[in-house]
Each structure stands twice: as structure tokens, then as C-alpha cells.
Amino acid sequence: MIKKECMTAEWIKAISVRNKYKDLNLIEKVIRAMSLLEMLKLSGCPFCFKGGSALMLILGESAHRLSIDIDIICPPGTDIEPYLKDIEKFGFISKTLEERQQRDTNIPKSHSKFFYHIAYKNDDKPAYILLDVLYEDLQYHATEEVEIKGPFIELDNEPLMVTVPSADDILGDKLTAFAPNTSGIPYIKGGRDRSLEIIKQLYDVGKLFEHADNFQHTKDTFTQIGKIELQYRGLPAELSLIYEDIRETALCLATRGQMGKGDFNMLQSGIKKIDGYIYKGKYRIEEAIVDSARAAYLATSIEKSSTRIEKYDGNLNTLLAMELSPSVNNKLNKLKKVLPEAFFYWVKTSELLQK
């Protein structure tokens, strides 16, 4: 389990110095989120850990984005309340819990806030960690057990294990979320700007793309979750809507708003905001264009029933004979010199669309 000293100001500040990352608030939130995860595991709650925070465990040292919410899936009909009783033992002072149906959707969720006293500064106002529970049968084809550990925490014994989707499965899940006009996170929700959340999905798709190696699992999970998300939103159960949405959003990024159905200003805003959540490196528009090209290629590969995906090998000679098919706009040729990897995936996308 996580050592108690990890929730002290001294520890949080030491972690900040060690990682050259200044946001003490986010460091503490990551530690508290992992503590909440330990509580859920020890309570016996039946769950699968998913979402951005799960990627910190799935990707290990390759995970450079911090996530501070705990997203889990529980079987339909689960009563979550009995599993949330030991909050004081895990550093929390109170909680709120509400069952809800999200507005304008039929998504069965519960939403909780777990409050704690801030350790790194003297402040009477408590902070909180969010727990989102989705009550649904698992749509993943493979799960695995991973250790609860990370660069911000230290353990006093063997790490606890939690169930997470495979990298291939969660890639399919995340890909459906990068479709802001259909199955994914919308630009605006409840009057709030959600551009940061959209870009978080894109960033995760890019990271997972580098680790996934079972395209069939990615394809199957995308297909199942995509249909469910369309149903939740009252949209026709036509996956073609999602494929097109992903490509149009990627095209909007690739041409910096000149083409594609998307809100480039909001996407650009999300790219600027995500930097605060990345504790190693930066995420710029150029990286987002590459990741969105990967997303477009993945979505099109699923649409066209490909059996495998090809990955760019970094060799510029690979691009010499490559040309865009007429199925995509030739303005994307500009990527060949400036972002060769993005160009590679747009060529592959265009070839699939041309068939």
C-alpha cells in the first residue's frame, strides 16, 4: 500500500523537485487518486479500472500525462455505496455520492467526490478526487492485472493489483472518444468548454498506438463501444458517422482549420491546456497533427476491414514514392516535408478510402 508519508507536504515538494514538475496540486491529486484506487481494491468492489488514470499503470514509464479522476466499470446493478465506507483510512474526510443519468443521454453512471485536506499548503478549503462509475457489462476482449505503482508514490509492501483493459482494447475505446460530433467528447457540454478533454483522448490514442499490437482487439472494441455510445446519444447506429467524424476532426487539425468539420480554435485551445498535465516533455500542434493522422488511419482501417495496421518506420526514404490518392485533399501534401509521419498515415488512409 501507499506509505502515509506520501501524503505530506515534504513528500509532495520532494517529488516536484525530483521530476522537475512544479504543479504541487496535480502531484497531490495523483497520489490521492491512487489511494482511492487502493481503497476500492481492498473493499472487494467488482470493477475494471479504465480511463486516463488507468493509462498511468498500463503504460508505466511511457505514461507522461497525469490524470486525476478514477473511472471504473462495474456490473449492471452494482450498489457502489458499501464499498466506499473506509474513506478515513485512506486519507479522505468526506464524500458525496449521486446516482445519475447524464443529461440528454441514457448513460447509467454514478458520480462521487472524495474530499481531503490539502497537504502542500495551509488551506481550510478541502480539495477532492472524482470517482465515475459506469454500470455496464465489459466490452473489452482482453483484460490484464497491473500493479498500483508510479513515480509519485512509494509503497510499504507488495503493490496491489487491479484489472485494466489491454492496451489494444483501451485504444479502441479511446478512439471512439475522439469523435466530438458523434460518439466522443463534445466541444461544449453543459455550457462548459471540453476542448481539453478532447485533446486528452487524442494524446492517449497517440501513446496507445505505439504500444498496441493486436489490431483485431482494437477493432472489435471500437465497434462494440462505438455502437453503444451512438445509442446513448440517440444517434443512428451507423459506425460510418464515427469514422467520418474522426477523419474530419483530424483533417481540421492537419490543415489548421482550413478544411475539415471541426472547431480548430477550440482544438488548439485544448492543446495549450494539456501541457499542464504532462510532466515529461511538451505536446504541441505538430504532435497533435501526427496523432490525429494515426487516429484517422486507425478509424479507416477499421471501416475498411483491414486485418493489420502499418506503422511508420522513421525512414524518410519510405516516403519518396508515396503519393496521396484522390480520396483526400491534396493540400495534405504539405505534410510530406514538415511532418512526414503524419503524411505517411494520411497516404495510408487515402489508399484505403480509394479502394
Roles of regions detected by a PLM:
Residues K4, I15-V17, V30-M34, Q102-Y283, ...:
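Catalytic cores of NTP-dependent nucleotidyl/adenyl transfer enzymes across multiple folds
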